[in-house]
């Protein structure tokens, strides 16, 4: 089952893979992930490499290299069992491929190992995964606007994500959160985000740690009447987050989004009734005046008869 899950996820999101091919980050990551295989199989280069094979064929993997690659495959499958999105699946594969490449290159030649490790460090410092740029109904807060928006209308329920741009978990969760905002956003239920990596005061006020060890990123907090009602993940006494998976199904269930959405839609309809244009009010005036006009004309005819 661990082998089929990433395969099905890859096939389901296959159309998105073509978009990645146009992004330099994934192209460079692909070449760095298969660097050792390319060098070991490249004609004109592989003949000059050392090998532990009995037949002396330096253009094929020896038994130790095969063991390392098999161990890598097992680690990737175990890690991907908890992956939510295709970005996380691909990110795990790229990460462990680079780790395996470092080990294989150092085992082959220490100079190649140092060169590859240097390339990985430079790549990590200069290239970042592309951010989610798809459609969404999300309001972005700053340290000055978040309190104002939460207190603006106590009838509005807010779901706010506390995130940091450098966090891989937040980057992977961005598309899931955007999809939820497209499905459930309405007049009485709104979605917001605040970058606590940028606004440290917000992080302290709402008790969301930016430390990677705390594992509190991302954090989803539900506000009703301007006050916090619940949050995920929960935090224990030591300040560490209780393990929780940020899937769309879990969020809908834990935050009762279907029920909140139905209640919020009723609030939106009430607002529309209260905010109707004045033209609708004026249109009722002639209907009320017509009976009065008929009464007046009837009284005039009666008075004429009396005369």
UniProtKB/Swiss-Prot annotation:
Keywords: Disulfide bond, Endoplasmic reticulum, Membrane, Mitochondrion, Signal, Transmembrane, Transmembrane helix
Gene Ontology CC terms, in alphabetical order: endoplasmic reticulum membrane; mitochondria-associated endoplasmic reticulum membrane contact site; mitochondrial membrane; mitochondrion
Residue ranges annotated for the Thioredoxin domain, each copy included: 132-269
Cited Pfam families: Thioredoxin (PF00085)
Cited SUPFAM superfamilies: Thioredoxin-like
Disulfide bonds: none
Ranges annotated as spanning the membrane: 112-132
Gene Ontology MF: a single term: disulfide oxidoreductase activity
Cell location: Endoplasmic reticulum membrane; Mitochondrion membrane
Entry note about domains: The thioredoxin domain lacks the 2 redox-active cysteines, suggesting that it lacks thioredoxin activity. The di-lysine motif confers endoplasmic reticulum localization for type I membrane proteins.
Protein name (database record): Thioredoxin-related transmembrane protein 2-B
Lineage, broadest ranks: Eukaryota, Metazoa, Chordata, Craniata, Vertebrata
Name of encoding gene: tmx2b
């Amino acid at each position: 089952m661990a082998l089929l899950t990433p395969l099905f996820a890859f096939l389901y999101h296959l159309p998105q893979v073509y978009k990645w091919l146009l992004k330099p980050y994934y192209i460079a990551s692909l070449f760095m992930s298969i660097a050792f295989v390319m060098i070991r199989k490249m004609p004109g280069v592989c003949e000059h490499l050392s090998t532990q094979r009995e037949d002396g064929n330096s253009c094929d993997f020896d038994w130790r290299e095969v063991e390392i690659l098999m161990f890598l495959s097992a680690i990737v499958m175990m890690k991907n069992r908890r992956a939510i999105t295709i970005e996380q699946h691909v990110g795990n594969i790229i990460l462990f491929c680079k780790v395996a490449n470092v080990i294989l290159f150092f085992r082959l030649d220490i100079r190649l190992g140092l060169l590859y490790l240097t390339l990985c460090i430079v790549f990590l410092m200069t290239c970042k995964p592309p951010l989610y740029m798809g459609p969404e109904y999300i309001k972005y807060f700053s340290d000055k606007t978040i309190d104002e928006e939460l207190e603006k209308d106590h009838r509005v329920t807010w779901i706010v994500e506390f995130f940091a741009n450098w966090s891989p978990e937040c980057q992977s969760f961005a598309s899931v959160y955007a999809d939820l905002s497209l499905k459930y956003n309405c007049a009485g239920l709104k979605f917001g985000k605040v970058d606590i990596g940028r606004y440290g005061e917000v992080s302290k006020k709402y008790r969301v740690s930016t430390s990677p060890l705390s594992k509190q990123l991302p954090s989803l907090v539900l506000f009703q009447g301007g006050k916090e009602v619940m949050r995920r993940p929960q935090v224990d006494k030591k300040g560490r987050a209780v393990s929780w998976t940020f899937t769309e199904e879990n969020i809908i269930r834990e935050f009762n989004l279907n029920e909140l959405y139905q209640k919020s839609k009723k609030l939106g309809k009430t607002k529309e009734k209260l905010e109707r244009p004045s033209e609708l009010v004026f249109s009722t005036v002639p209907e009320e005046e017509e009976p009065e006009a008929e009464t007046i004309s009837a009284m005039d005819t009666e008075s004429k008869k009396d005369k």
